Amino acid sequence: LSPAAAIAVSNVFAPTERDKQTRIGVSEIGDDCERCIADKLLGIPHYTENTGTPLAPFLGTAFHAFAESRTKNEPNVLVEQRVEVCDLEDYGRISGSVDRFDIAAATALDWKLLSRKKISVFRKSIKWDNALPRFANTAAGSQFRKYYIQIMLYGYGLTQLGHEVAHCSIVALPRDCSVEVVPDSICEFSFPWRQDVALAAIERLKNIWKRARSHDGRVDSIKSSPLCWYCSHEHHTEAFKNYNMNG
């Protein structure tokens, strides 16, 4: 890059406070992989071969900022509403931001910028059984279930603020679009809000946290998910196996 372009890129893609976040967030609680959740809770970093700013999440962050600026003054709508979902003993409060909550419709929305292929695979990875979603036992199904748990937790956080929640939606937009138009290219996955799903996710998180801190400070007994890309590529470092609660 030229010096001028290098400076521009450096400034635009500088890490945000969210990028620097080391504590676990609501979006990570539904991860199938208990070992990765334990990593996050204990502050064990994940290393990747890539350096620099990942472009896909950056585009998602940029869209969220744009959506917030366009809609934050709408009546009867909460945009980027902070919610708290639980308080882990000796860890602290875990909170997140709901992209959009329509108070009149009692519906929480979560924007997702995904590839067209991922949206298509998501459609195929879910089936309904007596109005309940069943996710395929695949990598895509695992990721979709993670998103589903995330929005159930957002709904729970909203109820803790006194709001009534009836539905939660994942609104997926194709980030690799070309001639697609809105709204035809948008895919909404709408679910009835279920408190039991949120409470089960919170209880699981507490259980992982308890186990991560037990075993005389060792955490290597916590198992990986067979669907976890990070673990399947053996990206866990020796730091995990040798991690000790006392450092």
Where are these regions (language model features)?
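A short acidic, glycine-rich active-site loop
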Residues: W128-Y148
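Metal-dependent nuclease catalytic cores that hydrolyze phosphodiester bonds in DNA/RNA
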Residues: L1-A108, S115-D129
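A short beta-strand motif that forms part of the nucleic acid-binding face
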Residues: K112-S115, P174
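Residues forming well-ordered secondary-structure scaffolds
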Residues: R93-G96, K146-I149, L153, A200
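Metal-dependent nuclease catalytic regions and adjoining charged, substrate-binding loops involved
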Residues: L1, T138-R145, Y156-G247
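Short amphipathic alpha-helical face segments that pack within enzyme cores
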Residues: A62, F66, I149-G157
